[in-house]
Amino acid sequence: MTQLEEQLHNVETVRSITMQLEMALAKLKKDMMRGGDAKQYQVWQSESKAIESAIAIIHYVAGGLK
């Protein structure tokens, strides 16, 4: 088991990381709603997808702990 996997089996660590990612995602979505040019919107979309993927991976590795 990698160090990250070990950390992700700690409920508090999972909550903390997930909360930080969800806050970052909320900020991105808020920025997207404010608007910007097409290129900036694409960057925000890519970042949003990356954060959503990170959350999904954490939940998968952590075995659904939250």
Curated annotation (Swiss-Prot):
Keyword entries, A-Z: Cytoplasm, Plasmid, Virulence
UniProt subcellular location: Cytoplasm
Principal location class: cytoplasm
Top-level taxon of origin: Bacteria
Pfam families reported in the protein's UniProt record: T3SS_needle_E
Disruption phenotype: Mutant is unable to secrete the Yop proteins upon thermal induction in a Ca(2+)-deprived medium.
Family the UniProt entry places it in: Belongs to the YscE family.
Name by which UniProt lists this protein: Type 3 secretion system chaperone YscE
Lineage: Bacteria, Pseudomonadati, Pseudomonadota, Gammaproteobacteria, Enterobacterales
Gene: yscE
